[in-house]
Amino acid sequence: MAVQQNKKSRSRRDMRRSHDALTTAAVSVDARGETHLRHHVTADGYYRGRKIK
């Protein structure tokens, strides 16, 4: 089992975690007022203003 030789400082630990922050989802509102994820089909089947089959 691997065991560290020296204790990592709070600074080193926090620098490693600097990229772990969560981001909010990019939500778009189309012309009809419906919200959806960018580059995704809406719940009622529209994409870029057109009805998808």
UniProtKB/Swiss-Prot annotation:
Residues 1-27 are annotated as: Disordered. Keywords: Ribonucleoprotein, Ribosomal protein. Belongs to the bacterial ribosomal protein bL32 family. This is Large ribosomal subunit protein bL32. GO terms for biological process: translation. Residues 7-16 have a biased composition (Basic residues). It holds the Pfam family Ribosomal_L32p. GO terms for molecular function: structural constituent of ribosome. GO terms for cellular component: large ribosomal subunit. The keyword NAD does not apply. The keyword Ribonucleoprotein applies. It comes from Glaesserella parasuis serovar 5 (strain SH0165). It comes from the Bacteria.
